[in-house]
């Protein structure tokens, strides 16, 4: 246990979950690996200080409850208070797509990008069917599962999610134009930059930027220098608007430009045609003669790393791979 988090030592929450170590941080609060002391099972625990200026873990826990049972939505074990924290106990998952992108030397093959795109579209669609938009679609918020779920992609971090329509009446939230940017500027839709209320189309457009980030290794509006955060957002917005989709997607299959143009063309209240978007990439996948065998780029690397470790140590130990493998 690192001395810096000494206060968390022997910290047991929900009567049976013992904190082990910090494994990450979400939009609000830190994530810890914990063990269920009754059966030895590993879980993830999200902690938020009760003194937080804008507490949102209770909100996030309610959202997870609404989404429970969806494919690729982590299962919630417990929500409550412990010491001076709000506590959310959930399934332990594997590394994020950002972790895996780095693990693969920031290069994904087209096969991997297309297999991911299929699952990512489905995860966002599911959240939308439950009347919410995510509003922070980025590689860090998509995690691979572990064990028998190791090929399944999970969507996490619903701290910024918002209800976009009424459950009963299906009444859509009204169009507004005075909003501050919510989410991560790098992947934000153009309309989000312009202060327009977000809706389903914005989650889909953000996904388009995530896919091109994987294809290109970086986006043209990354690494822009500015004195203030506001000025940086301005610069990102300007660069995004002045980069034609065709330029952004140059050198890659036309389907990526088709995807982005489709998303940008959606009206505020319009439901995206998720099946059309999945089919776009599925047909491309087949055209490229790939097999949908869940062999991702990191699957190969993990196997190589494990083999090297086994041969060098004479034992079948796992080599150092991102946390959660």
Swiss-Prot record:
GO MF annotation terms: ATP binding; magnesium ion binding; peptide binding; phosphoprotein binding; protein kinase activity; protein serine kinase activity; protein serine/threonine kinase activity
UniProt entry keywords in alphabetical sequence: Acetylation, ATP-binding, Cell cycle, Cell division, Cell projection, Centromere, Chromosome, Cytoplasm, Cytoskeleton, Kinase, Kinetochore, Mitosis, Nucleotide-binding, Nucleus, Phosphoprotein, Serine/threonine-protein kinase, Transferase, Wnt signaling pathway
CDD domains for this protein: STKc_CK1_alpha
Top-rank taxon: Eukaryota
A matching Pfam family: Pkinase
Enzyme class: transferase
Residues bearing the modification N6-acetyllysine: 8
One GO BP: intermediate filament cytoskeleton organization
Chief location category: cytoplasm
UniProt binding sites for ATP: 23-31, 46
Membership in a protein family: Belongs to the protein kinase superfamily. CK1 Ser/Thr protein kinase family. Casein kinase I subfamily.
Protein name: Casein kinase I isoform alpha
Organism: Rattus norvegicus
Organism lineage string: Eukaryota, Metazoa, Chordata, Craniata, Vertebrata
